[in-house]
A protein has these predicted regions:
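Short, well-ordered loop/turn sites that connect or cap secondary structure elements
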Residues: 115-116, 135
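Beta-rich strand-turn-strand
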Residues: 106-109
């Protein structure tokens, strides 16, 4: 996953792309930028421009690179007679880092990616360090016993109570 100017990307693509985009600081800075007017206002985006923005939004939201995203799209296109956009989101939602985020173990997708890549998460009893690992429906996801006393997971036990 590429690091870079998160606020600039959030302003361009809209909110809810990164965890930082959901803070009050971002909403305040966004309203200040909207007040400024330009001498040359931007025109209506083309169909291609809208598709590019949607692709970039999905790519940044799920923390994939261009190549990974392209591979997911190619994999989905091979399946005949299905809704490709729904299948693409199913593929992205079944990634290990996204499942850890959806379970509430991590507060953001980037933190979930870090927890998986540092080996704090067990999938079916095996330590997995690949954030893009595909999770199936009956897979068991646990926190590694040696990692349970970390500060990240202490908050989790308080939330669960």
């Amino acid at each position: 996953m590429k690091t870079g100017p998160k606020f600039k990307i959030c302003r361009r693509l809209g909110d809810r792309v990164f965890g930082k985009c959901q803070t009050t600081k971002f909403t305040i800075s966004g309203t200040e930028k909207k007040r400024k007017t330009s001498k040359h206002p931007k025109g209506q985006p083309s169909e291609y421009g809208l598709q590019l923005l949607e692709k970039q939004k999905a790519k940044y939201t799920y923390g994939t690179t261009e190549k990974q995203f392209r591979n997911y799209v190619d994999k989905v296109k091979k399946v005949k007679g299905s809704n490709h956009s729904v299948d693409l989101y199913k593929e992205l939602e079944s990634r290990a880092d996204n499942v850890v985020f959806r379970m509430g173990i991590a507060s953001t997708r980037s933190l979930a990616r870090q927890l998986v890549s540092h080996g704090h998460i067990l999938i079916n009893g095996k330590k997995t360090r690949v954030p893009s690992a595909k999770i199936k429906i009956k897979d068991v996801i646990k926190i590694r016993p040696e990692s349970r006393n970390k500060a990240v997971f202490k908050d989790l036990t308080e939330k669960a109570k």
